[in-house]
Amino acid sequence: MVATDTVQLTDRQRSVRDAVGDICDEFDAAYWREHDAEGEYPHDFVNALAEEGWLGVLLPEEYGGKGYSTEEAVAMMYTIARSGAGFSGAQTVHAAIYNSAPLVNYGSEELKSDLLPRVASGDAWIQCFSLTEPKAGSESTAIETEAVRDGDEYVINGEKLWTSRIDVSDYLVLAARTTPREEVEKKTEGVSLFLVDIERGHEAGSLDLEEIDKTASGVVSSFRVTYDDLRVPADRLIGVEDEGFYQVLDGLNEERLVIAAETVGLGELAVEKGVDYANEREVFGRAIGQNQAIQHPLAAGHARLQAAKQFTFAAAKRTGDEDRKAVGAWANTAKYLAAEAAFEAADAAVQTHGGRGIDRAYDVERYLREARLTRLVPVTQELALNYLGENVLGLPRSY
């Protein structure tokens, strides 16, 4: 086994790693391979985490959560990915953990008291955030889905893309314009967040789902969603009307650090698979791992991953810094480094396997698909570099 215990963890991080690792040990490589191939959500895995309260890792203790911080979340999600679940396995619970953040920070006390304890216990899932739109893409302020006040309700109409896990969620957080873009001084104004009861939306005939036939992260389904006169009670507005975009930004950097940790876990998994195969496979009378053409790409992948890992875990300790721009720099750097390292590592693992690299039975083809995805989500590598160029290097804004 490749030694990757290179980061000094706190006592609490070690406790999280061990507890979550024990759960992950119950789900082997075959479990994830089969669920990915079938496009099946891993209910057993997620339920096992929920039963131990891990979906409430970031929720305050007063609402039944564990009350932990980004440091512990990084350890938790890294452990899940590294266990064999990969990036997609971590993504099956990632949203359940982070979609509650707007409610914690901005929701009414009545809403928090009712819903958050159920989220912490796993009895209610907020697995879905509906933001991206076909025309807006990464330009989130350009969304056109609108929410119009009608008495004690909002009526929502619009179309969203890449809305994931709506098929396994009880609620979703929806971003919509409550003031048209042309009527606000800043393009970041006029967006609001809403908590949507998915079952109620289906019963009213206001949700139309079209599943996207994608090639990565098979255990998580994604959809094009059309909202047709969806009525949402006014008390399900999260926070202050027209300030939803700022609510989305709050906590975004911390989430990117967790994404980076998941990505590092995936990359280490790929390197280990490559090393194991390189030691076992013999050609021309010797193990292929004896050849530098095999050794060097795997060694380089390992080195890059350990650098990204060190940066990610170190940055997680600094998320309480009041300088949010600095936290943003750490988060975007970690995300960029981790995605580049994981992709190179997964590619090396596939190449090491030769023709077997595209055989599902060896898993590395899945790791490569997932590693490629990490260069696109939650933001592209180019957007991460844009942030660094403008906010760290002091270069002119490019967009």
Model-derived segments and spans:
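Hydrophobic, small-residue-rich alpha-helical packing segments that form membrane-like cores
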Residues: 133-139, 154, 163-164, 189
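Glycine-rich phosphate/pyrophosphate-binding beta-alpha loops
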Residues: 96, 136-137, 161-166, 218, ...
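Alpha-helical interface subdomain recognition
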Residues: 1-84, 93, 106-111, 122, ...
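A short, Trp-centered hydrophobic/proline-enriched beta-strand micro-motif
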Residues: 122-131, 175
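A short core secondary-structure module
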Residues: 157-207
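Flexible, small-/acidic-enriched active-site or ligand-binding loops
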Residues: 142, 201-231
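N-terminal glycine-rich flavin-associated loop
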Residues: 88-110, 137
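Long, acidic (Asp/Glu-rich), low-complexity accessory segments flanking structured domains
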Residues: 228-246
